[in-house]
Design a protein with these regions (language model features):
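Structural/interface elements that position substrates and couple domains in central-metabolism enzymes
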Residues: 2-5, 10-13, 23-458
Length: 458
Protein backbone atom coordinates (compact mmCIF):
# COMPACT_ATOMS: atom_id res chain seq x y z
CA UNK A 1 0.00 0.00 0.00
CA UNK A 2 1.00 3.59 -0.47
CA UNK A 3 2.17 5.27 2.73
CA UNK A 4 0.99 8.72 3.86
CA UNK A 5 3.61 11.32 4.80
CA UNK A 6 3.35 14.93 5.89
CA UNK A 7 1.56 17.51 3.75
CA UNK A 8 -0.91 14.74 2.74
CA UNK A 9 1.52 13.46 0.09
CA UNK A 10 1.77 9.77 -0.74
CA UNK A 11 4.61 7.65 -2.04
CA UNK A 12 4.67 4.15 -3.48
CA UNK A 13 7.47 1.90 -2.13
CA UNK A 14 9.90 0.80 -4.81
CA UNK A 15 9.50 -2.94 -5.47
CA UNK A 16 12.57 -4.65 -6.98
CA UNK A 17 11.91 -5.68 -10.56
CA UNK A 18 11.81 -9.51 -10.80
CA UNK A 19 14.03 -10.82 -13.56
CA UNK A 20 13.53 -14.50 -14.43
CA UNK A 21 16.60 -16.48 -13.46
CA UNK A 22 16.92 -17.90 -16.96
CA UNK A 23 17.22 -14.42 -18.44
CA UNK A 24 19.84 -13.45 -15.87
CA UNK A 25 21.85 -16.55 -16.76
CA UNK A 26 21.48 -15.96 -20.47
CA UNK A 27 23.19 -12.63 -19.97
CA UNK A 28 26.28 -14.67 -19.02
CA UNK A 29 26.50 -16.18 -22.50
CA UNK A 30 29.69 -15.36 -24.32
CA UNK A 31 29.25 -13.62 -27.65
CA UNK A 32 29.76 -16.09 -30.47
CA UNK A 33 32.73 -14.07 -31.69
CA UNK A 34 34.50 -14.82 -28.38
CA UNK A 35 33.37 -18.43 -28.06
CA UNK A 36 35.54 -21.51 -27.85
CA UNK A 37 33.90 -24.70 -29.07
CA UNK A 38 34.49 -28.28 -27.96
CA UNK A 39 33.51 -31.12 -30.30
CA UNK A 40 33.13 -34.43 -28.43
CA UNK A 41 33.60 -37.33 -30.85
CA UNK A 42 35.65 -37.05 -34.05
CA UNK A 43 34.10 -39.67 -36.30
CA UNK A 44 32.08 -39.33 -39.50
CA UNK A 45 29.95 -36.58 -37.92
CA UNK A 46 32.25 -34.79 -35.50
CA UNK A 47 35.33 -34.26 -37.65
CA UNK A 48 33.65 -32.51 -40.62
CA UNK A 49 31.75 -30.32 -38.15
CA UNK A 50 34.91 -29.50 -36.20
CA UNK A 51 36.75 -28.52 -39.38
CA UNK A 52 33.85 -26.33 -40.51
CA UNK A 53 33.74 -24.47 -37.19
CA UNK A 54 37.55 -24.23 -37.07
CA UNK A 55 37.54 -21.89 -40.04
CA UNK A 56 35.80 -19.27 -37.88
CA UNK A 57 36.28 -20.30 -34.25
CA UNK A 58 38.82 -21.78 -31.87
CA UNK A 59 37.82 -25.45 -31.67
CA UNK A 60 39.00 -28.28 -29.44
CA UNK A 61 38.30 -31.70 -30.93
CA UNK A 62 38.13 -34.49 -28.34
CA UNK A 63 38.02 -38.25 -28.82
CA UNK A 64 38.83 -41.18 -26.54
CA UNK A 65 40.25 -43.23 -29.44
CA UNK A 66 44.00 -42.67 -29.19
CA UNK A 67 44.70 -44.14 -32.62
CA UNK A 68 42.09 -41.90 -34.22
CA UNK A 69 43.47 -38.78 -32.52
CA UNK A 70 47.06 -39.58 -33.51
CA UNK A 71 45.95 -40.07 -37.12
CA UNK A 72 44.13 -36.73 -37.17
CA UNK A 73 47.00 -34.91 -35.49
CA UNK A 74 49.14 -36.02 -38.43
CA UNK A 75 46.62 -34.49 -40.80
CA UNK A 76 44.97 -37.62 -42.19
CA UNK A 77 41.36 -38.80 -41.99
CA UNK A 78 40.93 -42.47 -42.89
CA UNK A 79 37.16 -42.04 -43.23
CA UNK A 80 37.85 -39.73 -46.20
CA UNK A 81 35.11 -37.36 -45.07
CA UNK A 82 37.63 -34.51 -44.80
CA UNK A 83 40.40 -34.04 -47.34
CA UNK A 84 43.87 -34.09 -45.84
CA UNK A 85 44.82 -30.65 -47.16
CA UNK A 86 41.71 -29.09 -45.62
CA UNK A 87 42.31 -30.81 -42.28
CA UNK A 88 45.94 -29.73 -42.25
CA UNK A 89 44.99 -26.12 -43.02
CA UNK A 90 43.02 -25.76 -39.76
CA UNK A 91 45.12 -27.92 -37.41
CA UNK A 92 46.67 -26.23 -34.38
CA UNK A 93 49.37 -27.50 -32.05
CA UNK A 94 49.28 -27.04 -28.28
CA UNK A 95 51.21 -23.76 -28.33
CA UNK A 96 49.58 -22.25 -31.41
CA UNK A 97 48.35 -18.72 -30.71
CA UNK A 98 46.07 -18.38 -33.72
CA UNK A 99 42.58 -17.14 -32.88
CA UNK A 100 40.86 -19.80 -34.98
CA UNK A 101 41.65 -23.40 -35.82
CA UNK A 102 41.34 -26.97 -34.55
CA UNK A 103 43.31 -28.56 -31.74
CA UNK A 104 42.77 -32.32 -31.41
CA UNK A 105 43.31 -34.20 -28.17
CA UNK A 106 42.41 -37.13 -25.92
CA UNK A 107 42.85 -34.96 -22.82
CA UNK A 108 39.53 -33.91 -21.34
CA UNK A 109 41.19 -31.10 -19.40
CA UNK A 110 41.91 -29.31 -22.67
CA UNK A 111 38.19 -28.56 -22.92
CA UNK A 112 38.04 -26.65 -19.64
CA UNK A 113 37.92 -23.14 -21.08
CA UNK A 114 35.32 -23.92 -23.75
CA UNK A 115 31.89 -22.35 -23.41
CA UNK A 116 30.08 -24.37 -26.10
CA UNK A 117 30.15 -28.17 -26.09
CA UNK A 118 28.86 -30.17 -29.07
CA UNK A 119 28.34 -33.93 -28.68
CA UNK A 120 28.70 -36.02 -31.84
CA UNK A 121 29.14 -39.54 -30.49
CA UNK A 122 27.48 -42.70 -31.88
CA UNK A 123 24.08 -43.94 -30.68
CA UNK A 124 24.08 -47.67 -31.48
CA UNK A 125 21.76 -50.50 -30.51
CA UNK A 126 22.63 -53.71 -28.68
CA UNK A 127 22.21 -57.25 -30.03
CA UNK A 128 18.53 -57.10 -29.07
CA UNK A 129 18.07 -53.84 -31.04
CA UNK A 130 17.65 -51.78 -27.88
CA UNK A 131 19.06 -48.22 -27.84
CA UNK A 132 22.45 -47.82 -26.21
CA UNK A 133 22.96 -44.32 -24.80
CA UNK A 134 26.25 -45.13 -23.07
CA UNK A 135 28.44 -43.05 -25.44
CA UNK A 136 26.20 -40.00 -24.90
CA UNK A 137 26.15 -40.51 -21.14
CA UNK A 138 29.94 -40.82 -20.99
CA UNK A 139 30.33 -37.69 -23.10
CA UNK A 140 27.91 -35.84 -20.84
CA UNK A 141 29.85 -36.95 -17.76
CA UNK A 142 33.06 -35.58 -19.28
CA UNK A 143 31.40 -32.26 -20.04
CA UNK A 144 29.67 -32.05 -16.65
CA UNK A 145 33.01 -32.17 -14.87
CA UNK A 146 34.04 -29.01 -16.74
CA UNK A 147 30.70 -27.21 -16.98
CA UNK A 148 30.52 -23.57 -15.89
CA UNK A 149 27.76 -21.00 -15.63
CA UNK A 150 26.73 -19.66 -18.99
CA UNK A 151 27.87 -22.74 -20.92
CA UNK A 152 25.79 -24.34 -23.67
CA UNK A 153 25.76 -28.08 -24.40
CA UNK A 154 24.49 -29.09 -27.85
CA UNK A 155 23.75 -32.68 -28.85
CA UNK A 156 23.87 -33.88 -32.47
CA UNK A 157 23.61 -37.65 -31.94
CA UNK A 158 20.43 -39.25 -33.28
CA UNK A 159 18.07 -40.14 -30.41
CA UNK A 160 14.41 -40.62 -29.60
CA UNK A 161 12.44 -37.56 -28.42
CA UNK A 162 13.26 -36.67 -24.83
CA UNK A 163 16.81 -37.99 -24.54
CA UNK A 164 18.46 -34.57 -24.25
CA UNK A 165 16.27 -33.19 -21.49
CA UNK A 166 15.18 -36.39 -19.76
CA UNK A 167 18.36 -38.47 -19.96
CA UNK A 168 21.34 -36.13 -20.47
CA UNK A 169 20.38 -33.03 -18.50
CA UNK A 170 20.12 -34.99 -15.19
CA UNK A 171 23.68 -36.25 -15.79
CA UNK A 172 24.92 -32.72 -16.40
CA UNK A 173 23.14 -31.38 -13.31
CA UNK A 174 24.20 -34.19 -10.99
CA UNK A 175 27.91 -34.00 -11.72
CA UNK A 176 28.28 -30.26 -12.26
CA UNK A 177 26.03 -29.14 -9.41
CA UNK A 178 24.60 -26.53 -11.77
CA UNK A 179 20.95 -25.88 -12.58
CA UNK A 180 19.54 -26.45 -16.05
CA UNK A 181 18.22 -23.30 -17.75
CA UNK A 182 19.54 -21.20 -14.88
CA UNK A 183 23.26 -21.94 -14.86
CA UNK A 184 23.72 -23.79 -18.15
CA UNK A 185 21.65 -24.49 -21.25
CA UNK A 186 21.17 -27.14 -23.90
CA UNK A 187 20.50 -27.32 -27.60
CA UNK A 188 19.88 -30.06 -30.12
CA UNK A 189 20.87 -29.93 -33.78
CA UNK A 190 20.65 -33.35 -35.44
CA UNK A 191 23.52 -34.43 -37.67
CA UNK A 192 22.75 -34.90 -41.33
CA UNK A 193 26.05 -36.28 -42.55
CA UNK A 194 25.82 -38.60 -45.56
CA UNK A 195 29.06 -40.67 -45.53
CA UNK A 196 30.82 -40.81 -48.86
CA UNK A 197 28.74 -37.99 -50.37
CA UNK A 198 31.14 -35.32 -51.66
CA UNK A 199 28.33 -33.11 -52.95
CA UNK A 200 26.15 -32.82 -49.84
CA UNK A 201 28.85 -32.02 -47.29
CA UNK A 202 28.16 -30.69 -43.79
CA UNK A 203 27.99 -27.00 -44.69
CA UNK A 204 25.80 -27.66 -47.73
CA UNK A 205 23.00 -29.46 -45.88
CA UNK A 206 20.30 -27.37 -44.21
CA UNK A 207 20.59 -27.71 -40.43
CA UNK A 208 17.74 -28.08 -37.94
CA UNK A 209 18.49 -26.28 -34.67
CA UNK A 210 16.79 -25.91 -31.29
CA UNK A 211 17.43 -24.62 -27.79
CA UNK A 212 16.18 -25.07 -24.24
CA UNK A 213 14.81 -21.50 -24.09
CA UNK A 214 13.79 -19.12 -26.88
CA UNK A 215 16.96 -17.09 -26.31
CA UNK A 216 19.17 -20.17 -26.40
CA UNK A 217 17.39 -21.36 -29.55
CA UNK A 218 18.42 -18.08 -31.19
CA UNK A 219 21.98 -18.48 -29.89
CA UNK A 220 22.33 -22.05 -31.18
CA UNK A 221 20.75 -21.12 -34.50
CA UNK A 222 23.13 -18.20 -34.94
CA UNK A 223 26.10 -20.45 -34.16
CA UNK A 224 25.23 -22.94 -36.90
CA UNK A 225 24.11 -20.26 -39.30
CA UNK A 226 27.60 -18.79 -39.13
CA UNK A 227 29.09 -21.87 -40.87
CA UNK A 228 26.20 -23.67 -42.62
CA UNK A 229 25.89 -22.03 -46.02
CA UNK A 230 22.71 -24.00 -46.79
CA UNK A 231 20.97 -22.23 -43.91
CA UNK A 232 19.15 -23.38 -40.80
CA UNK A 233 15.65 -24.23 -39.62
CA UNK A 234 14.86 -23.37 -36.01
CA UNK A 235 12.55 -25.99 -34.47
CA UNK A 236 10.09 -24.95 -31.77
CA UNK A 237 11.74 -27.06 -29.07
CA UNK A 238 14.40 -29.72 -28.50
CA UNK A 239 11.96 -32.64 -28.61
CA UNK A 240 10.64 -31.55 -32.00
CA UNK A 241 14.18 -31.44 -33.37
CA UNK A 242 14.93 -34.89 -31.90
CA UNK A 243 11.75 -36.34 -33.40
CA UNK A 244 12.41 -34.74 -36.79
CA UNK A 245 15.77 -36.46 -37.08
CA UNK A 246 14.62 -39.91 -36.05
CA UNK A 247 11.73 -39.89 -38.54
CA UNK A 248 14.00 -38.79 -41.41
CA UNK A 249 15.79 -42.12 -41.28
CA UNK A 250 12.73 -44.14 -40.29
CA UNK A 251 10.82 -42.86 -43.30
CA UNK A 252 13.64 -43.83 -45.64
CA UNK A 253 13.91 -47.27 -44.03
CA UNK A 254 10.19 -47.89 -44.55
CA UNK A 255 10.26 -46.72 -48.17
CA UNK A 256 13.18 -49.03 -48.96
CA UNK A 257 11.41 -51.88 -47.16
CA UNK A 258 8.43 -51.39 -49.47
CA UNK A 259 10.49 -51.76 -52.65
CA UNK A 260 12.41 -54.66 -51.11
CA UNK A 261 9.10 -56.42 -50.55
CA UNK A 262 8.08 -55.62 -54.11
CA UNK A 263 11.34 -57.18 -55.25
CA UNK A 264 10.48 -60.44 -53.51
CA UNK A 265 6.98 -60.43 -54.99
CA UNK A 266 8.05 -59.59 -58.53
CA UNK A 267 10.81 -62.19 -58.38
CA UNK A 268 8.13 -64.84 -57.78
CA UNK A 269 6.12 -63.43 -60.68
CA UNK A 270 9.08 -63.37 -63.05
CA UNK A 271 8.99 -59.58 -63.41
CA UNK A 272 12.06 -57.32 -63.27
CA UNK A 273 11.65 -54.96 -60.31
CA UNK A 274 13.85 -52.21 -61.73
CA UNK A 275 11.83 -52.11 -64.93
CA UNK A 276 8.62 -51.84 -62.90
CA UNK A 277 10.06 -48.98 -60.83
CA UNK A 278 11.27 -47.20 -63.95
CA UNK A 279 7.80 -47.37 -65.47
CA UNK A 280 6.04 -46.30 -62.26
CA UNK A 281 8.55 -43.48 -61.84
CA UNK A 282 7.16 -41.70 -64.88
CA UNK A 283 4.40 -40.36 -62.65
CA UNK A 284 5.42 -37.03 -61.11
CA UNK A 285 4.58 -37.94 -57.51
CA UNK A 286 5.96 -41.48 -57.42
CA UNK A 287 8.71 -41.76 -54.80
CA UNK A 288 11.84 -43.22 -56.36
CA UNK A 289 13.50 -45.80 -54.13
CA UNK A 290 15.44 -48.88 -55.16
CA UNK A 291 15.72 -52.27 -53.45
CA UNK A 292 18.92 -53.16 -51.62
CA UNK A 293 20.69 -53.86 -48.37
CA UNK A 294 19.96 -51.36 -45.59
CA UNK A 295 22.87 -50.96 -43.20
CA UNK A 296 25.08 -48.28 -41.75
CA UNK A 297 24.88 -46.43 -38.50
CA UNK A 298 21.71 -44.48 -39.29
CA UNK A 299 18.92 -45.95 -41.39
CA UNK A 300 19.31 -49.48 -40.06
CA UNK A 301 19.50 -48.35 -36.43
CA UNK A 302 17.45 -45.20 -35.83
CA UNK A 303 13.97 -46.75 -36.31
CA UNK A 304 14.63 -48.86 -33.22
CA UNK A 305 15.08 -45.66 -31.20
CA UNK A 306 11.67 -44.38 -32.26
CA UNK A 307 10.12 -47.80 -31.65
CA UNK A 308 11.59 -47.92 -28.14
CA UNK A 309 10.07 -44.56 -27.20
CA UNK A 310 6.73 -45.52 -28.72
CA UNK A 311 6.64 -48.71 -26.65
CA UNK A 312 7.53 -46.78 -23.50
CA UNK A 313 4.52 -44.58 -24.23
CA UNK A 314 2.29 -47.64 -24.51
CA UNK A 315 2.09 -47.92 -28.30
CA UNK A 316 3.39 -50.86 -30.31
CA UNK A 317 4.64 -49.56 -33.67
CA UNK A 318 3.61 -51.76 -36.57
CA UNK A 319 5.01 -50.28 -39.77
CA UNK A 320 8.34 -49.18 -38.28
CA UNK A 321 9.23 -52.64 -36.96
CA UNK A 322 7.80 -54.43 -40.00
CA UNK A 323 10.08 -52.35 -42.20
CA UNK A 324 13.07 -53.27 -40.07
CA UNK A 325 12.26 -56.98 -40.23
CA UNK A 326 11.83 -56.85 -43.99
CA UNK A 327 15.08 -54.99 -44.61
CA UNK A 328 17.03 -57.21 -42.23
CA UNK A 329 15.89 -60.24 -44.26
CA UNK A 330 17.39 -59.09 -47.55
CA UNK A 331 20.92 -60.39 -47.01
CA UNK A 332 19.62 -63.90 -46.36
CA UNK A 333 17.29 -63.58 -49.35
CA UNK A 334 20.18 -62.63 -51.68
CA UNK A 335 22.22 -65.62 -50.52
CA UNK A 336 19.34 -68.05 -50.98
CA UNK A 337 18.45 -66.73 -54.43
CA UNK A 338 22.07 -67.08 -55.50
CA UNK A 339 22.11 -70.70 -54.34
CA UNK A 340 18.89 -71.38 -56.27
CA UNK A 341 20.55 -70.08 -59.43
CA UNK A 342 23.58 -72.28 -58.80
CA UNK A 343 21.27 -75.29 -58.54
CA UNK A 344 19.44 -74.30 -61.74
CA UNK A 345 22.79 -74.35 -63.53
CA UNK A 346 23.69 -77.65 -61.93
CA UNK A 347 26.63 -76.07 -60.11
CA UNK A 348 27.94 -77.65 -56.93
CA UNK A 349 26.86 -75.76 -53.80
CA UNK A 350 28.68 -77.47 -50.93
CA UNK A 351 32.37 -76.49 -50.99
CA UNK A 352 31.75 -74.20 -53.95
CA UNK A 353 33.82 -71.02 -54.25
CA UNK A 354 31.81 -67.79 -54.18
CA UNK A 355 33.00 -64.19 -54.31
CA UNK A 356 31.25 -61.23 -52.69
CA UNK A 357 32.21 -57.89 -54.22
CA UNK A 358 32.00 -55.19 -51.57
CA UNK A 359 31.67 -55.16 -47.80
CA UNK A 360 31.12 -51.53 -46.79
CA UNK A 361 27.56 -50.49 -45.97
CA UNK A 362 27.37 -48.23 -49.03
CA UNK A 363 29.27 -47.50 -52.21
CA UNK A 364 32.51 -45.51 -52.47
CA UNK A 365 32.87 -45.18 -48.72
CA UNK A 366 35.12 -47.04 -46.22
CA UNK A 367 32.42 -47.26 -43.52
CA UNK A 368 31.71 -50.86 -42.50
CA UNK A 369 29.51 -50.08 -39.49
CA UNK A 370 26.40 -52.27 -39.43
CA UNK A 371 26.99 -53.49 -42.98
CA UNK A 372 24.37 -56.03 -43.98
CA UNK A 373 26.73 -57.71 -46.43
CA UNK A 374 27.68 -59.78 -43.40
CA UNK A 375 24.20 -61.35 -43.56
CA UNK A 376 24.89 -62.61 -47.07
CA UNK A 377 28.23 -63.99 -45.92
CA UNK A 378 26.84 -65.88 -42.92
CA UNK A 379 23.92 -67.36 -44.87
CA UNK A 380 26.25 -68.65 -47.58
CA UNK A 381 28.61 -70.12 -44.98
CA UNK A 382 25.68 -72.02 -43.47
CA UNK A 383 25.56 -73.98 -46.75
CA UNK A 384 29.26 -74.86 -46.43
CA UNK A 385 30.20 -72.55 -49.28
CA UNK A 386 33.75 -71.16 -49.41
CA UNK A 387 33.19 -67.41 -49.42
CA UNK A 388 35.77 -64.78 -50.36
CA UNK A 389 35.12 -61.06 -49.94
CA UNK A 390 36.87 -58.35 -51.94
CA UNK A 391 36.53 -54.66 -51.13
CA UNK A 392 39.20 -52.07 -52.02
CA UNK A 393 37.50 -49.49 -49.76
CA UNK A 394 37.22 -51.45 -46.52
CA UNK A 395 39.99 -51.77 -43.95
CA UNK A 396 40.69 -55.52 -43.53
CA UNK A 397 41.93 -55.04 -39.95
CA UNK A 398 38.76 -53.19 -38.99
CA UNK A 399 36.58 -55.87 -40.60
CA UNK A 400 38.52 -58.60 -38.82
CA UNK A 401 38.08 -56.83 -35.49
CA UNK A 402 34.39 -56.04 -35.91
CA UNK A 403 33.12 -59.08 -37.80
CA UNK A 404 35.77 -61.78 -37.27
CA UNK A 405 36.10 -62.48 -41.00
CA UNK A 406 38.94 -61.97 -43.46
CA UNK A 407 38.51 -59.80 -46.54
CA UNK A 408 40.93 -58.82 -49.29
CA UNK A 409 41.87 -55.51 -50.91
CA UNK A 410 43.24 -57.38 -53.95
CA UNK A 411 40.93 -58.42 -56.76
CA UNK A 412 41.05 -62.19 -57.35
CA UNK A 413 40.46 -63.95 -60.65
CA UNK A 414 36.70 -63.74 -61.20
CA UNK A 415 36.79 -66.91 -63.25
CA UNK A 416 37.74 -68.97 -60.21
CA UNK A 417 34.26 -68.69 -58.70
CA UNK A 418 31.01 -70.56 -59.24
CA UNK A 419 29.11 -67.41 -58.27
CA UNK A 420 29.82 -63.71 -57.88
CA UNK A 421 27.58 -61.41 -55.86
CA UNK A 422 27.95 -57.68 -56.53
CA UNK A 423 26.85 -56.49 -53.09
CA UNK A 424 28.13 -52.90 -53.04
CA UNK A 425 28.05 -50.61 -56.07
CA UNK A 426 31.56 -49.15 -55.86
CA UNK A 427 32.39 -47.27 -59.07
CA UNK A 428 35.33 -49.60 -59.74
CA UNK A 429 33.03 -52.62 -59.70
CA UNK A 430 30.93 -51.25 -62.53
CA UNK A 431 33.98 -51.55 -64.78
CA UNK A 432 34.54 -55.25 -64.07
CA UNK A 433 33.90 -57.73 -66.85
CA UNK A 434 31.09 -59.72 -65.28
CA UNK A 435 29.07 -61.88 -67.67
CA UNK A 436 26.71 -64.69 -66.77
CA UNK A 437 27.55 -68.12 -68.14
CA UNK A 438 26.67 -71.78 -67.72
CA UNK A 439 29.56 -72.12 -65.30
CA UNK A 440 28.97 -69.03 -63.16
CA UNK A 441 26.10 -67.18 -61.47
CA UNK A 442 26.19 -63.37 -61.30
CA UNK A 443 23.86 -61.67 -58.81
CA UNK A 444 23.65 -57.87 -58.94
CA UNK A 445 22.22 -56.67 -55.62
CA UNK A 446 22.09 -52.98 -56.56
CA UNK A 447 21.04 -53.37 -60.19
CA UNK A 448 23.95 -51.32 -61.58
CA UNK A 449 25.18 -53.76 -64.23
CA UNK A 450 23.67 -54.38 -67.64
CA UNK A 451 20.66 -56.61 -67.12
CA UNK A 452 21.80 -58.95 -69.89
CA UNK A 453 25.09 -59.62 -68.08
CA UNK A 454 23.58 -60.92 -64.84
CA UNK A 455 21.43 -63.84 -63.80
CA UNK A 456 19.50 -62.02 -61.12
CA UNK A 457 19.10 -58.75 -59.27
CA UNK A 458 16.84 -57.42 -56.57
Amino acid sequence: MAAKIKNNQYFVPLVPLHVPSSLKSESMLKPLSESKIAIIGLGYVGLPLAVAFAEKYKVIGFDINVQRVEELQKGHDHTLEVKDDLLQSVLLNHSDERAVGLYITTAGGALSDCNIYIVTVPTPTDKHNRPVLTPMIKASETIAGLLKKGNVVIYESTVYPGVTEEEMVPVLERISGLKYNEDFFCGYSPERINPGDKEHTVTKILKVTSGSTPQIADYVDALYKSVIVAGTFKASCIKVAEAAKVIENSQRDINIAFVNELSKIFNLLGIDTHEVLEAAGTKWNFLKFKPGLVGGHCIGVDPYYLAQKAQEAGYHPEIILAGRRLNDSIGKHVAQETIKWMMRKDLKVIDAKLLILGFTFKEDCPDVRNTRVIDIYHELKSFDINVDVYDPWANPAEVKHEYKITISNSLPDLGDYAAVILAVAHQDFKKLHLVKSDKQVVFDVKGVLNKDCVDARL
